[in-house]
Each structure stands twice: as C-alpha cells, then as structure tokens.
Amino acid sequence: FVPFRSPSIAALPRRKESVAFAQELWRDLLTHWQPRLLITIDTGTFANLQSILLSQAGARSADHEHFPTGWGEYQAEAVRIARPGIAPAVTLARLPHLSRFALFGRPASRPHMDRLLSRLAQGLADR
C-alpha cells in the first residue's frame, strides 16, 4: 500500500505523510483501474483500501465476512464492494501477515484457507 520500504509501518519515516501519499496514489489509481480482487496482509492497508473503494460514487459494502485461519484467534476477512454503474464489484481480502503465519500448506489451516479461497474465487466468477 505504502510504496516506501520499511521493516514495519511503525518504523516508516514520516509515516503520516507517507500514508497520506499512499492514500492519494491509490485513490487516483482506482479511478483508472477497476480490479475485481485485492488481497492485503495487514489491517491498516485493508481499512485504507476499503475506505477509498467505498468513497467511489455509488459504492456500497455488499457483504463482509471473517474467516478462521487455524491460528487461534487470528482471522482473515473479505468484503465485497458493489460499484453499480462504475465497474464490477471488487472483493477486498485481508490475510494475517504471511511472513508470520504459515497459512498455505499447513494442515491446521487448510480447511479454513480452502473456504476463504473458494469465497474469493466466487467473487471473481460473479459478473
């Protein structure tokens, strides 16, 4: 989301200005590019992109679902945002950070990831 390298958002130099720049960048990008699926790995990026998408004319949240991950209380989530008259609906998903949580190939996470991935694929198949 923020196009500047940093080990974490907390360590990002000039964080406030960097996030403001990223919000404007994505706002402009999403007026010209109409993705059907966006996947994030942190809550801040998810919240920022959701806010930007919902600020588009006529956009509305069609459904929001949380998914267990097999890592205790850590969850993934997906929200479908309808954009009538603008573009096809977009599904915005958030996973726990993949460098910290092995979600794919881990037996305890497999049924949960299968359910999430099925939901994301359904969003791509819907017209």
Map each language-model feature to its residues.
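Proline-aspartate-enriched helix->loop->beta-strand connector
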Residues: 26-43
